[in-house]
From Swiss-Prot:
GO terms for cellular component: cytoplasm; mitochondrion; nucleus. Residues 1-49, 103-125, 1137-1166, 1177-1196 are annotated as: Disordered. The N-terminal 153 residues are responsible for the prion properties of NEW1. Keywords: Amyloid, ATP-binding, Cytoplasm, mRNA transport, Nucleotide-binding, Nucleus, Phosphoprotein, Prion, Repeat, Transport. The lineage of its organism: Eukaryota, Fungi, Dikarya, Ascomycota, Saccharomycotina. This is [NU+] prion formation protein 1. ATP 1 binds at G604, R605, N606, G607, A608, G609, K610, S611. Residues 39-49, 103-113 have a biased composition (Polar residues). It comes from Saccharomyces cerevisiae (strain ATCC 204508 / S288c) (Baker's yeast).
Amino acid sequence: MPPKKFKDLNSFLDDQPKDPNLVASPFGGYFKNPAADAGSNNASKKSSYQQQRNWKQGGNYQQGGYQSYNSNYNNYNNYNNYNNYNNYNNYNKYNGQGYQKSTYKQSAVTPNQSGTPTPSASTTSLTSLNEKLSNLELTPISQFLSKIPECQSITDCKNQIKLIIEEFGKEGNSTGEKIEEWKIVDVLSKFIKPKNPSLVRESAMLIISNIAQFFSGKPPQEAYLLPFFNVALDCISDKENTVKRAAQHAIDSLLNCFPMEALTCFVLPTILDYLSSGAKWQAKMAALSVVDRIREDSANDLLELTFKDAVPVLTDVATDFKPELAKQGYKTLLDYVSILDNLDLSPRYKLIVDTLQDPSKVPESVKSLSSVTFVAEVTEPSLSLLVPILNRSLNLSSSSQEQLRQTVIVVENLTRLVNNRNEIESFIPLLLPGIQKVVDTASLPEVRELAEKALNVLKEDDEADKENKFSGRLTLEEGRDFLLDHLKDIKADDSCFVKPYMNDETVIKYMSKILTVDSNVNDWKRLEDFLTAVFGGSDSQREFVKQDFIHNLRALFYQEKERADEDEGIEIVNTDFSLAYGSRMLLNKTNLRLLKGHRYGLCGRNGAGKSTLMRAIANGQLDGFPDKDTLRTCFVEHKLQGEEGDLDLVSFIALDEELQSTSREEIAAALESVGFDEERRAQTVGSLSGGWKMKLELARAMLQKADILLLDEPTNHLDVSNVKWLEEYLLEHTDITSLIVSHDSGFLDTVCTDIIHYENKKLAYYKGNLAAFVEQKPEAKSYYTLTDSNAQMRFPPPGILTGVKSNTRAVAKMTDVTFSYPGAQKPSLSHVSCSLSLSSRVACLGPNGAGKSTLIKLLTGELVPNEGKVEKHPNLRIGYIAQHALQHVNEHKEKTANQYLQWRYQFGDDREVLLKESRKISEDEKEMMTKEIDIDDGRGKRAIEAIVGRQKLKKSFQYEVKWKYWKPKYNSWVPKDVLVEHGFEKLVQKFDDHEASREGLGYRELIPSVITKHFEDVGLDSEIANHTPLGSLSGGQLVKVVIAGAMWNNPHLLVLDEPTNYLDRDSLGALAVAIRDWSGGVVMISHNNEFVGALCPEQWIVENGKMVQKGSAQVDQSKFEDGGNADAVGLKASNLAKPSVDDDDSPANIKVKQRKKRLTRNEKKLQAERRRLRYIEWLSSPKGTPKPVDTDDEED
C-alpha cells in the first residue's frame, strides 16, 4: 500500500479542473470540443461525441445508407466525387484521407485505441485501397479484384476468387507468367494491410491458395509462385484467427506445389531471406516451421548442400532478443544440424549448436574438438558448423595460448581431410586472417610453429588439380550453361510444357537450380522424372531427356570412368543404388558397374560398408542388380560352422541348396583340386584350421560355377603357399568377375585390374592395381606403410610384476609339452619347449593346421597339455585376442561395447579367463574338493572350503586356507607344493588369476566415462562404444572391442592370433605403432609378413608338430611411415644379439642374489696357498702359457 501522502494516478486526474476544450469519451480518453474551434459547427453545444453521432445520423451512416453508398460507388472512380452528394457537404474537407488534424486530435492523455477498427477507420482504409486499385493497370482480373472489398461475406469473396481462377484457365492465360504480368503479388500486398477489413485480408490468402492449387502439377510454372511466400508469412502475424488459418493454408498449398529438390534449392533460400528481414516475430516463428517441414520432407544429401547458407541465418534466429523466437530457433538449428551424417561430429552436435548460440562456450567446444580423431571425410556441411567456432576462437582476445594451439591443430587436421578443394574454398578467406594473426602475435613459439603449418596447408596451391579437371560439383553458372546448351536441341512438340518458357528468365533460373542440385547429389532418377514432367511424356522427349541430359551429365561427373569400348569387356552390371545399415547411410545414390572377367578391389575404411555391400549383393537385396538366374554370385567368407561342425567335408558341401544336383564324386574332385586329399576329406568341418575352412568355401564356389565371386578377406587365414594358389586361381579364370575386400596390399597388387574406392558415400573407380591407385590418389599411401596418422591406438602400460626386475627374465614357460586333440591319430604338438619375457616380440609362423593356435592356447591356459608342464608367474596377466574375434562377443550381441566391458569385469575378475579349460573344475575335481587332507599341523584331516590369501615362501608361495566347518581364526598357511600334490592345482590357479586381475584393476574405475575413454584409446568412437549394439558392428570394430577388453586390466603379455584379419589399413597401422611403443611382451600369429617383419625380431616356426625357435638380425622398421622407433622394447640393438629370455629353473624366474660369505682365517690361508701353487705351476709351464686368473671358485 502506497504512503498516504501519495495519490494514485486516477485520483489525481479526477481532482484536476475540467478543461472546457476537452470532452470525455465513454471509451476512455478525451476528444477536443468542436465548439472551441473557430471553424467548427458552433451552433450546437453538444459534446464532441454527440456531435459525431449527429454527423453519422445526418450522413445516413446506418446500414441502409452504407449499402446505398456501396451501390453508388461503381459509378465513380474515387472518393473525390463524393462532394456531389448533399448529405456529405462537409466530406469534401477529407478528400478520402480520413480526419484532418485540425478537426480531430488525440489528447496526450488518451490511451491507445483498441485493435478493432471503428467504422470511420474501415471506411478510410477501403477508400485508400480502392484508390490504389484504381491506379493499377487494368488486367483481365482487375474487375474481380476491385469487387472483393465490397463483399459482405466470405462466400461472396470466394465467388470472385473463383472467377479469377477461371480467368487463368482460359486459353493463353494458363501460364504462370501471368502472375507477374498481372502484378498479383502487388495487389495482394495491398490487400493484407492491417487497416483493411479482415475479410479482405483473408481473401488475399484464399487467392494464394487457389492459385497454388491451380498450378500444382504443372512444372515448371510453380517457379512464379515463390513471391507469394512472403505475403503469406506476413499474414501469419495477423490478429484475426481466420486470417491466420487462411495464411497457414496458403503456405501449405504453396509447399505442396514444389518438388523435393526445389524445396531445398528454391524455397529454402527465400525462407532464409525472410528470417533475415525485419518481419514480426510471429511470422518468423511460422518461417521456422516451414524450415522444419522442408527438413522433414527432403533428402539429407540435398539439405547438406544448404548448410553454408542456412546455419548462419538459423544461428542469428537462435540468438534473437525475443525469447520465444530464440527458443524455437535453437530447436530448429539443432534438428537441422543433426541430419549431417558424420561419425566424428555426431556426439558433439549439441555442444556445437550451444557454442554457435553462446560464444562463451568456445573454449569448451575447441577443447572437445581437439580430442577428436578425425577420420570421416570433411565436407562443406561439416565446415559450415566448425569454421564459425574456430574463427571466433582465433579472434577472441580472451583466447589462451593453449586454446589457440588446439584451434590451429584442428584447422590443420580438418583441411588435410578435405578431399575436394572446392569444399573448403569459400571458408579459407574466413580462416586465413585469424591464422595469420596467430602466426604474427602468439607468444609461445610452439603455437606460432603450429599456426605456420596450418597456414601452409590452407595456402597449398592445387593448380594441378584444377587444370582441365572437373571439380566434382556443378556450380549454378555451369548448370545454367549446360541447360541452355541442351535446350537448343529440344524438339518442342505440342506435349512439351517448357516450350512457352524457353526464353523466360524465371523458369531458366528455376530449372538450372534443380538440375544443379540433383546432379551434385547424383540423383539421376529424380532428375530424369522432373525433366520428363517438364518436357513432356512422349517417347521422343523421354529419349531426349535420357540421352542428351542425363547421359551427358553423368559423363561429366564420371570423367575418370571410361565407358565400355569394344576391347574393354562385356558389361554385366550397371545399376544405381543406395545402401543403408540401420539408421546410417553407407552409400548414397551411387553407381555399381562391373565388367566380365575384371577383378575389383573394394577399398575403404572400417565401417564404410564393404562387407555390407557384398552381403547385399549375395542376398539379392541390391536395387537393379541382375537376379540369380541371370547372374550367379557366390559370397566367399570365413565363417564359423555351428551344428554343421561334426559333418565330413563332402556332406557339408552337399547340404548347399544350390548343389543338390551335384554328385558326391564331383564334390570330392573339387575338394581334391584345392588340396584336400582323402585323409583331409575324412576330417570334420570343426577340426579344420582357419586356412582350410577358407579353401573349403572356395571349393563350394567352384562347384556353383559362379559368374561373380565375392571374396571377403580371402587371405586372412591362408598361409603363403595357399595365398599363392589363390592368386593363380583368380588369374587363370578370366571368365570370372571378382569383387574382393582385402587389406593384404601384396594380394591386391597381384590380382586386381580395377580399384573401387569409397569416397564420401560414393563408389569411385580407378583403373589398375593398388599401386596404380596410390599413384592417382597419394592420400591412400597407408596401403603400403604402417602409420597412425589416420587412426590412433594407445595401450595402457603393463603393471609391475612382483619380483621381476629385468625385462629379459622368463615370466611364462612351456617345458616338454605334448598335446593332441581327442580322437586325433597323432599329437598336434610334440615335446615343445619355449619361454617368454616382458621384452619378447615373437612371431609364431607356420602353414595352416600346423598347430600355431594350439601352441598359443596351451601357453595362455585355454588348453591343458597331455604331457609336460606350463608354468607362469603367479601374478602374470595375459591379454588374449583369439583368431575369431567374434567368439568373445558372440553371446553379447545385444549389449553395447561399454556394457560388455562392464559385464566382463564387474566382479573384479576377467570372466573370459574363467571360461578357459584350465580353469574349469571337472566332476572328478569337484569330488576331490570334498576330500579331507592332513597338513601335519596337529589338527587332523580337514576339507578345504576356499583359498583366501597368499604370501611369499622362499622361491614359491604359500596360501591361506579356510577349512570347512572351522572358524577363520583356525585358517592355515599351506605351501603351494602341498596343495598341488593333493590335486588342488586349479583351485590355486583360480586364486592366482584373481590376485593378478585384482592387482591389474587396482587403478581402474569400472564406470562408463572411464570405459569410454579406454575405447577411444584403442580407436573406437565413443558414440559407437556407448550406443551401438555389438551385433551391428563391423569386423574391424569388433576387433577393437576385443582389444579394449583384453587391455582393460593392464596385462603384461599380449597374445594376438591373426590380429590383422578384420582391420583396415588405417587401423592396422595404428595397431602396429601401438604394439611397437608398448612396454609389455607380445606374441602374435600372422601371415602378414609386412606386419610381422616390422615388429618381431624373434620367430617360432611350427611345423609337423615340432617347434623351432629362430632369431632375426633386425626388424624392417622402414615399413613405418615415421621410420620406426629404435628404442622400442625388444628392438634395441643390444637385445638382438642375445636371446630375449634368461632361462632358469624357476617358473617365476625370480633369482635370489647370493650374499657373499666372509672367509675365516683358515680359509684365507688355504686360498693363499692355492694361489701360490697356481703361480709356481705357471712359472714352470712352457713359455707363452697365459697366466691363470686368481679365483675363489674351486672348479675354476
